[in-house]
Regions:
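Transmembrane alpha-helical segments that form core, pore/gating elements
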Residues: 37, 61, 120-122, 126, ...
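Helix-helix packing/entry segments at the starts of transmembrane helices
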Residues: 28, 52, 90, 94, ...
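Hydrophobic/aromatic residues within transmembrane alpha-helices
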Residues: 41, 49, 53, 100, ...
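Specific transmembrane alpha-helical segments of multi-pass solute transporters/efflux pumps
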Residues: 30, 34-35, 62-113, 149-150, ...
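Glycine-/small-residue-enriched transmembrane alpha-helix faces in small-molecule transporters
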Residues: 2-51, 87, 95, 99, ...
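Hydrophobic transmembrane alpha-helices of multi-pass small-molecule transport proteins
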Residues: 61, 83, 122-123, 135-155, ...
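Structural signature of hydrophobic alpha-helical transmembrane segments
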Residues: 45-57, 99-117, 162-175, 224-238, ...
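Transmembrane alpha-helices of multi-pass small-molecule transport proteins
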Residues: 2-3, 19, 43-92, 117-123, ...
Length: 308
Protein backbone atom coordinates (compact mmCIF):
# COMPACT_ATOMS: atom_id res chain seq x y z
CA UNK A 1 0.00 0.00 0.00
CA UNK A 2 2.73 2.45 0.89
CA UNK A 3 5.68 3.61 -1.13
CA UNK A 4 8.72 5.73 -0.45
CA UNK A 5 8.42 9.46 -0.95
CA UNK A 6 8.43 10.44 -4.61
CA UNK A 7 7.56 6.98 -5.90
CA UNK A 8 4.35 6.11 -7.71
CA UNK A 9 2.11 3.64 -5.90
CA UNK A 10 1.76 0.39 -7.83
CA UNK A 11 -1.71 -1.16 -7.57
CA UNK A 12 -2.96 -4.57 -8.73
CA UNK A 13 -5.29 -4.70 -11.71
CA UNK A 14 -8.33 -5.52 -9.56
CA UNK A 15 -9.08 -6.37 -5.94
CA UNK A 16 -9.62 -10.02 -5.08
CA UNK A 17 -12.86 -11.18 -3.40
CA UNK A 18 -10.88 -11.95 -0.23
CA UNK A 19 -9.43 -8.43 -0.19
CA UNK A 20 -12.89 -6.90 -0.66
CA UNK A 21 -14.58 -9.04 2.00
CA UNK A 22 -11.88 -8.56 4.62
CA UNK A 23 -11.50 -4.81 4.14
CA UNK A 24 -15.25 -4.16 3.98
CA UNK A 25 -15.96 -6.12 7.16
CA UNK A 26 -13.10 -4.69 9.20
CA UNK A 27 -13.49 -1.12 7.95
CA UNK A 28 -17.25 -1.04 8.50
CA UNK A 29 -16.97 -2.51 11.99
CA UNK A 30 -14.28 -0.03 13.07
CA UNK A 31 -16.12 2.93 11.60
CA UNK A 32 -19.37 1.86 13.27
CA UNK A 33 -17.78 2.24 16.69
CA UNK A 34 -17.68 6.01 16.10
CA UNK A 35 -21.40 6.30 16.85
CA UNK A 36 -20.90 4.39 20.10
CA UNK A 37 -17.92 6.44 21.27
CA UNK A 38 -19.58 9.74 20.35
CA UNK A 39 -22.58 8.79 22.49
CA UNK A 40 -20.30 7.71 25.33
CA UNK A 41 -18.45 11.04 25.14
CA UNK A 42 -21.45 12.78 26.67
CA UNK A 43 -22.48 16.35 25.90
CA UNK A 44 -19.21 17.61 24.44
CA UNK A 45 -19.68 20.38 21.88
CA UNK A 46 -19.76 18.92 18.32
CA UNK A 47 -16.95 21.22 17.14
CA UNK A 48 -14.79 20.27 20.12
CA UNK A 49 -15.49 16.60 19.53
CA UNK A 50 -14.54 16.95 15.84
CA UNK A 51 -11.39 18.80 16.89
CA UNK A 52 -10.22 16.14 19.32
CA UNK A 53 -11.19 13.34 16.94
CA UNK A 54 -9.18 14.87 14.10
CA UNK A 55 -6.13 15.68 16.22
CA UNK A 56 -5.97 12.23 17.81
CA UNK A 57 -6.50 10.57 14.44
CA UNK A 58 -3.70 12.67 12.91
CA UNK A 59 -1.37 11.90 15.82
CA UNK A 60 -2.01 8.16 15.54
CA UNK A 61 -1.32 8.16 11.81
CA UNK A 62 1.77 10.35 12.28
CA UNK A 63 3.12 7.85 14.80
CA UNK A 64 2.56 5.08 12.27
CA UNK A 65 4.56 7.11 9.71
CA UNK A 66 7.41 7.53 12.19
CA UNK A 67 7.51 3.79 12.88
CA UNK A 68 7.53 3.11 9.12
CA UNK A 69 10.22 5.78 8.56
CA UNK A 70 8.00 7.45 5.97
CA UNK A 71 7.99 11.10 4.98
CA UNK A 72 5.05 13.30 6.04
CA UNK A 73 5.27 15.42 2.90
CA UNK A 74 2.33 15.27 0.47
CA UNK A 75 2.86 13.35 -2.76
CA UNK A 76 3.88 15.80 -5.49
CA UNK A 77 2.89 18.76 -3.34
CA UNK A 78 -0.76 17.68 -3.16
CA UNK A 79 -1.66 19.94 -0.24
CA UNK A 80 -4.95 20.88 -1.86
CA UNK A 81 -6.09 17.25 -1.73
CA UNK A 82 -5.41 17.21 2.00
CA UNK A 83 -7.53 20.33 2.50
CA UNK A 84 -10.47 19.10 0.41
CA UNK A 85 -10.52 15.65 2.03
CA UNK A 86 -10.03 17.16 5.46
CA UNK A 87 -13.27 19.05 4.92
CA UNK A 88 -15.44 16.58 2.98
CA UNK A 89 -14.28 13.42 4.74
CA UNK A 90 -13.19 14.99 8.00
CA UNK A 91 -14.36 17.91 10.07
CA UNK A 92 -17.63 18.61 8.22
CA UNK A 93 -19.16 15.11 8.65
CA UNK A 94 -17.59 14.78 12.11
CA UNK A 95 -19.38 17.92 13.31
CA UNK A 96 -22.62 16.91 11.59
CA UNK A 97 -22.66 13.40 13.09
CA UNK A 98 -21.87 14.69 16.58
CA UNK A 99 -24.75 17.16 16.30
CA UNK A 100 -27.17 14.64 14.80
CA UNK A 101 -26.57 12.14 17.61
CA UNK A 102 -27.85 14.72 20.09
CA UNK A 103 -31.14 14.67 18.19
CA UNK A 104 -31.70 11.05 17.06
CA UNK A 105 -30.61 7.54 18.02
CA UNK A 106 -27.46 5.91 16.73
CA UNK A 107 -29.21 3.17 14.74
CA UNK A 108 -31.50 5.52 12.72
CA UNK A 109 -28.53 7.83 12.14
CA UNK A 110 -26.46 4.98 10.72
CA UNK A 111 -29.34 3.82 8.54
CA UNK A 112 -29.72 7.29 7.03
CA UNK A 113 -25.97 7.51 6.47
CA UNK A 114 -26.21 4.16 4.67
CA UNK A 115 -27.73 6.06 1.75
CA UNK A 116 -24.20 7.13 0.85
CA UNK A 117 -23.73 4.46 -1.86
CA UNK A 118 -26.95 5.64 -3.52
CA UNK A 119 -25.59 9.18 -3.71
CA UNK A 120 -22.23 7.91 -4.95
CA UNK A 121 -23.93 5.86 -7.68
CA UNK A 122 -25.99 8.82 -8.93
CA UNK A 123 -23.07 11.26 -8.86
CA UNK A 124 -20.74 8.70 -10.49
CA UNK A 125 -23.28 8.26 -13.29
CA UNK A 126 -23.16 11.99 -13.94
CA UNK A 127 -19.38 12.35 -13.70
CA UNK A 128 -17.75 9.13 -14.96
CA UNK A 129 -18.32 7.25 -18.21
CA UNK A 130 -17.35 3.90 -16.64
CA UNK A 131 -19.76 4.23 -13.71
CA UNK A 132 -23.07 4.53 -15.59
CA UNK A 133 -26.30 3.48 -13.89
CA UNK A 134 -27.49 0.16 -15.28
CA UNK A 135 -31.23 -0.65 -15.08
CA UNK A 136 -30.54 -2.72 -11.98
CA UNK A 137 -28.65 0.09 -10.28
CA UNK A 138 -31.38 2.56 -11.19
CA UNK A 139 -33.97 0.32 -9.53
CA UNK A 140 -31.67 0.09 -6.52
CA UNK A 141 -31.48 3.88 -6.26
CA UNK A 142 -35.27 4.19 -6.43
CA UNK A 143 -35.75 1.51 -3.76
CA UNK A 144 -33.09 3.10 -1.56
CA UNK A 145 -34.72 6.51 -1.80
CA UNK A 146 -38.05 4.93 -0.86
CA UNK A 147 -36.37 3.57 2.25
CA UNK A 148 -35.05 7.04 3.03
CA UNK A 149 -38.62 8.29 2.77
CA UNK A 150 -39.70 5.73 5.36
CA UNK A 151 -36.90 6.80 7.70
CA UNK A 152 -37.17 10.56 7.27
CA UNK A 153 -40.79 11.09 6.19
CA UNK A 154 -42.32 10.93 9.69
CA UNK A 155 -40.19 13.89 10.79
CA UNK A 156 -42.66 16.14 8.96
CA UNK A 157 -45.52 14.92 11.18
CA UNK A 158 -46.34 16.86 14.37
CA UNK A 159 -45.65 15.09 17.66
CA UNK A 160 -43.70 12.40 15.84
CA UNK A 161 -40.95 12.53 18.45
CA UNK A 162 -38.40 12.53 15.62
CA UNK A 163 -36.04 15.45 15.05
CA UNK A 164 -36.20 16.64 11.42
CA UNK A 165 -32.92 18.51 11.86
CA UNK A 166 -31.21 15.40 13.17
CA UNK A 167 -32.38 13.36 10.19
CA UNK A 168 -31.48 16.05 7.65
CA UNK A 169 -28.08 16.48 9.29
CA UNK A 170 -27.36 12.80 8.65
CA UNK A 171 -28.44 13.23 5.01
CA UNK A 172 -25.93 16.07 4.73
CA UNK A 173 -23.32 13.79 6.31
CA UNK A 174 -23.97 11.10 3.70
CA UNK A 175 -23.68 13.69 0.92
CA UNK A 176 -20.35 14.95 2.28
CA UNK A 177 -18.91 11.43 2.43
CA UNK A 178 -20.20 10.71 -1.09
CA UNK A 179 -18.47 13.81 -2.45
CA UNK A 180 -15.24 12.77 -0.71
CA UNK A 181 -15.42 9.27 -2.20
CA UNK A 182 -15.71 10.70 -5.70
CA UNK A 183 -12.94 13.22 -5.09
CA UNK A 184 -10.52 10.48 -4.03
CA UNK A 185 -11.10 8.78 -7.36
CA UNK A 186 -9.75 11.84 -9.19
CA UNK A 187 -6.44 11.72 -7.29
CA UNK A 188 -3.71 9.97 -9.27
CA UNK A 189 -0.52 8.34 -8.02
CA UNK A 190 -1.01 9.19 -4.35
CA UNK A 191 -0.11 7.03 -1.36
CA UNK A 192 -3.41 6.21 0.43
CA UNK A 193 -1.69 6.30 3.82
CA UNK A 194 -0.36 9.80 3.20
CA UNK A 195 -3.79 10.92 2.01
CA UNK A 196 -5.27 9.58 5.24
CA UNK A 197 -2.68 11.45 7.31
CA UNK A 198 -3.23 14.68 5.41
CA UNK A 199 -6.97 14.36 5.74
CA UNK A 200 -6.76 14.08 9.52
CA UNK A 201 -4.31 16.98 9.81
CA UNK A 202 -6.59 19.17 7.71
CA UNK A 203 -9.58 17.96 9.69
CA UNK A 204 -8.25 18.50 13.20
CA UNK A 205 -6.74 21.96 12.67
CA UNK A 206 -9.82 23.63 11.09
CA UNK A 207 -12.12 21.91 13.60
CA UNK A 208 -9.99 23.19 16.48
CA UNK A 209 -10.05 26.72 15.08
CA UNK A 210 -13.82 26.60 14.63
CA UNK A 211 -14.29 25.14 18.12
CA UNK A 212 -12.35 28.02 19.68
CA UNK A 213 -14.33 30.58 17.69
CA UNK A 214 -17.79 29.02 18.03
CA UNK A 215 -17.66 27.42 21.48
CA UNK A 216 -14.69 29.12 23.14
CA UNK A 217 -11.75 27.62 25.07
CA UNK A 218 -14.00 26.75 28.02
CA UNK A 219 -15.76 24.12 25.89
CA UNK A 220 -12.60 21.99 26.01
CA UNK A 221 -12.93 21.66 29.80
CA UNK A 222 -15.19 18.63 29.33
CA UNK A 223 -12.56 16.72 27.34
CA UNK A 224 -10.62 15.09 30.25
CA UNK A 225 -13.81 13.53 31.61
CA UNK A 226 -14.33 11.64 28.35
CA UNK A 227 -10.67 10.97 27.57
CA UNK A 228 -11.04 7.21 27.10
CA UNK A 229 -13.98 7.50 24.68
CA UNK A 230 -12.29 10.29 22.73
CA UNK A 231 -9.03 8.37 22.47
CA UNK A 232 -10.89 5.34 21.11
CA UNK A 233 -12.84 7.61 18.76
CA UNK A 234 -9.66 9.09 17.32
CA UNK A 235 -7.75 5.82 16.90
CA UNK A 236 -10.19 2.91 16.59
CA UNK A 237 -13.01 4.81 14.87
CA UNK A 238 -10.98 7.23 12.75
CA UNK A 239 -7.29 6.56 12.06
CA UNK A 240 -7.56 2.83 11.41
CA UNK A 241 -10.71 2.74 9.25
CA UNK A 242 -9.80 5.80 7.17
CA UNK A 243 -6.45 4.19 6.36
CA UNK A 244 -8.25 1.06 5.18
CA UNK A 245 -10.91 3.04 3.35
CA UNK A 246 -8.46 5.15 1.34
CA UNK A 247 -6.79 1.97 0.16
CA UNK A 248 -10.16 0.42 -0.65
CA UNK A 249 -11.27 3.36 -2.80
CA UNK A 250 -8.01 3.36 -4.74
CA UNK A 251 -8.23 -0.39 -5.35
CA UNK A 252 -11.95 -0.89 -6.01
CA UNK A 253 -13.39 2.50 -6.97
CA UNK A 254 -15.85 4.76 -5.12
CA UNK A 255 -19.01 2.77 -5.76
CA UNK A 256 -17.64 -0.56 -4.48
CA UNK A 257 -15.78 1.08 -1.61
CA UNK A 258 -18.97 2.79 -0.47
CA UNK A 259 -20.37 -0.69 0.28
CA UNK A 260 -18.88 -0.01 3.71
CA UNK A 261 -22.08 1.97 4.24
CA UNK A 262 -24.06 -1.20 3.54
CA UNK A 263 -22.52 -2.97 6.52
CA UNK A 264 -22.08 -0.06 8.92
CA UNK A 265 -25.73 0.25 10.07
CA UNK A 266 -25.79 -3.46 10.89
CA UNK A 267 -22.80 -3.12 13.21
CA UNK A 268 -24.11 0.17 14.63
CA UNK A 269 -27.55 -1.28 15.39
CA UNK A 270 -25.99 -4.24 17.20
CA UNK A 271 -23.78 -1.92 19.27
CA UNK A 272 -26.67 0.46 20.01
CA UNK A 273 -28.82 -2.36 21.36
CA UNK A 274 -26.04 -4.12 23.29
CA UNK A 275 -24.12 -1.17 24.76
CA UNK A 276 -26.51 1.82 24.71
CA UNK A 277 -29.77 0.06 25.49
CA UNK A 278 -31.51 1.56 22.45
CA UNK A 279 -34.62 -0.07 21.00
CA UNK A 280 -35.34 -0.28 17.28
CA UNK A 281 -38.90 0.43 16.14
CA UNK A 282 -40.67 -1.24 13.23
CA UNK A 283 -40.42 1.92 11.09
CA UNK A 284 -36.66 2.23 11.58
CA UNK A 285 -36.17 -1.47 10.92
CA UNK A 286 -38.35 -1.42 7.79
CA UNK A 287 -36.76 1.75 6.43
CA UNK A 288 -33.27 0.43 7.10
CA UNK A 289 -33.96 -2.87 5.34
CA UNK A 290 -35.42 -1.05 2.30
CA UNK A 291 -32.43 1.31 2.13
CA UNK A 292 -29.94 -1.55 2.37
CA UNK A 293 -31.84 -3.51 -0.28
CA UNK A 294 -31.44 -0.58 -2.65
CA UNK A 295 -27.78 -0.22 -1.73
CA UNK A 296 -27.23 -3.93 -2.39
CA UNK A 297 -28.72 -3.64 -5.89
CA UNK A 298 -26.51 -0.62 -6.58
CA UNK A 299 -23.32 -2.08 -5.15
CA UNK A 300 -23.40 -5.72 -6.19
CA UNK A 301 -24.10 -5.26 -9.90
CA UNK A 302 -21.46 -5.14 -12.59
CA UNK A 303 -17.78 -5.97 -12.37
CA UNK A 304 -15.22 -4.40 -10.10
CA UNK A 305 -13.01 -1.82 -11.78
CA UNK A 306 -9.58 -0.91 -10.57
CA UNK A 307 -8.47 2.67 -10.07
CA UNK A 308 -5.12 3.42 -11.62
Amino acid sequence: MSTASGEVATLPAAPTPAFMATNLLVCSMLWSTSFLFIKLSGSINPFVLASIRGLIGASALALWFVVQAKSFRPDNGQWHHWVVLGALNGWIPNVLVAHALTQIGTAPAAMIQASGPLLVAVLSHLLYADERLTPRRFVGVVIGLAGMGILIGPTALPDSGISPWGALTMVATALSYAAANLYVRSIRHADPARLALGQQICSGIPATTLALVVAGPSAFAAVPGSAASLLALGIVSTALPILLFMRLIRRAGPTRASMVGYLQPVWTTIMAVLFLGESIGLRELTGGVVVLTGVALVSFSGRVKAIR
